[in-house]
């Protein structure tokens, strides 16, 4: 039986730039990188138990992707990302609870270097 999502993969156009972006702005730690053949390069980053796999394959593009990170300091995190110049896609707003045990929560969406959308909730 399934237990959890093991990792999320994002295809990027510049692996080094994207590794630095996720380390600097979101606190991910780059822990492994390798070539998988045919020019495919893969970098793995961790944030707690969450694994982000960044892939780069020359000539391929990515479209229509987002993932969500939870933060315990929503306003402070949003302020820091805006101060650092990370592109704001959708301003902070309230959203409904998606599960009975939850209250509503705040969300915001920022843009990554290749157009991926990074949602924050808190």
Which residue ranges define each predicted feature?
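Vicinal oxygen chelate
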Residues: 4-13, 43-46, 59-122
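A general structural signal for stabilizing positions within well-ordered secondary structure
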Residues: 22, 58-59, 99, 109
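Structural preference for long, well-ordered alpha-helical segments within the folded cores
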Residues: 20-21, 80, 114
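Short, flexible active-site-adjacent loop segments at beta-strand->alpha-helix junctions, enriched
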Residues: 49-51, 58, 73, 92-94, ...
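Conserved short beta-strand elements that form part of the metal-binding/catalytic scaffold
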Residues: 31-63, 111, 117-122
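Core segments of cupin and vicinal oxygen chelate
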Residues: 2, 9-51
């Amino acid at each position: 039986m399934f237990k959890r999502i093991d990792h999320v993969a994002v295809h990027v156009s510049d692996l080094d730039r994207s590794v630095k972006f996720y380390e600097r702005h979101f606190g991910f730690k780059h822990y492994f990188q390798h070539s998988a053949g045919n020019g495919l390069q893969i970098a793995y980053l961790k944030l707690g138990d969450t694994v982000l796999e960044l892939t780069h394959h020359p000539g391929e593009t990515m479209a229509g992707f987002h993932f969500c990170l939870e933060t315990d300091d929503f306003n402070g995190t949003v302020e820091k990302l805006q101060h650092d110049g990370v592109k704001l896609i959708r301003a902070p707003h309230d959203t409904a609870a998606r599960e009975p045990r939850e209250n509503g929560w705040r969300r915001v969406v920022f843009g990554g270097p290749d157009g991926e959308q990074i949602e924050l909730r808190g």
